Amino acid sequence: MKEEEVSFFSEGERISAILRLPDGSPPGSWPAIVQGPGWLGLKDAKLYLPYHEALTAAGYSVLIFDYRGFGESEGDRGVILPQLQLEDLTNAVTYLTTREDVDADNIGVFGSGGTGGGNAILLAASDDRIRVAVSQVPVADGEDWLHRMRREYEWQEFLDRLENDRRERVVTGTGEM
């Protein structure tokens, strides 16, 4: 497996990425998989290497990147918004289509973890260029997931905090959350 550090732009922010390629010469071009990391994950996390090694051994190129605001990518630090992550994934797909060593008609998405798996589903549903999607351990219902992480009294306290924060933001423009 060969690695190439690359970057592309997403809504004006430079996105840092790693393109992992199969060894050898492509048969014209490689089919590709794009992966946005899971919850707070980064492109160089060792967790993803076994997947990428298997995919490149099977003849796929793999693009993994740091979402904007994370790792080496530009953007507001630590902002986690699914719609921004979806834009980054969509722009990652567009970047792949610009490469001569990638088969632009054979691009898939792989996502692992709550946000990674959920974002893979969102991308596949919204981008006709995606031919296949693998979503491993997604959060499909965020409210249910947040609820199950708490005891009932903690859930009620959390809902009260959300409502108080909403009210504060409406009046002052800022809030806790």
At which residue positions do the language-model features occur?
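N-terminal cap/lid segment of alpha/beta-hydrolase-fold proteins
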Residues: 1-28
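Short beta-strand element of the alpha/beta-hydrolase
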Residues: 28-38
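Short, ordered loop/turn segments at secondary-structure junctions
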Residues: 38, 67-70, 112-114, 138
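The serine-hydrolase catalytic nucleophile loop
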Residues: 38-53, 67
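Catalytic nucleophile-loop/oxyanion-hole region of alpha/beta-hydrolase
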Residues: 43-45, 70-108
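Conserved alpha/beta-hydrolase
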Residues: 54-72
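Primarily recognizes the serine-hydrolase "nucleophile elbow" in alpha/beta-hydrolase
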Residues: 91-172
